[in-house]
Amino acid sequence: MNINNTLKLTLCGILAVSVLNSCSKKSDEAEIQPVKEEIGMTQVTIKTSVGEINLELDGDKAPITVKNFVDIANSGYFEGTIFHRVINGFMIQGGGLNADMSNKSSGTAPIQNEANNGLSNDRGTIAMARTMDPHSATSQFFINHKDNSFLNHTGENQQGWGYAVFGKVTDGMDIVDAIADVATGSAGGHQDVPLDVITIESVTVAE
């Protein structure tokens, strides 16, 4: 295996393990939500402590995921959570930890993985983070900092399900780049944590 492939597999493993730690307390929550309801395109603004990121969520391709994200956003849950995992040239991840690195439960059931919707993990897309269980995503998400095709759906099995893309950045990639470029270290049992806390101040869904 060449160095590039080894790095990709390592980064994918880091993502899965980090989310496993933050979502491990959700096993006793309700069963997976299977109902689909197409909701069209939704505009969302993530206001962070370093700037705003505007996104368009594709409710036609990922209706379950978009509804879940919008419902959580409208509840105010994301306020005060952080981008806790940042890897330059890979992705920035947030939506599940507090500033003190403690887990924050959204109280929502895990959702069906919609990674087989034809959307790819390209630079600037937003996707759901999860555990090794393909259908375990709740609130944590990541924004791809580059094209990460190895995260795409390749088959309906544990190894091939991939990570469900449900939208893309329409404005604010400079903020994503700035977050990806921050210095990181270890904190609270996690790696690749920004040394200066990057807070999600709000996630606003357009009317």
Segments predicted by a language model, with ranges:
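Residue-level detector of alpha-helix boundary/anchor positions
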Residues: 15-17, 159
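Sec-dependent N-terminal signal peptides
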Residues: 9-15
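C-terminal motif of bacterial Sec signal peptides marking the signal peptidase cleavage site
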Residues: 18-22
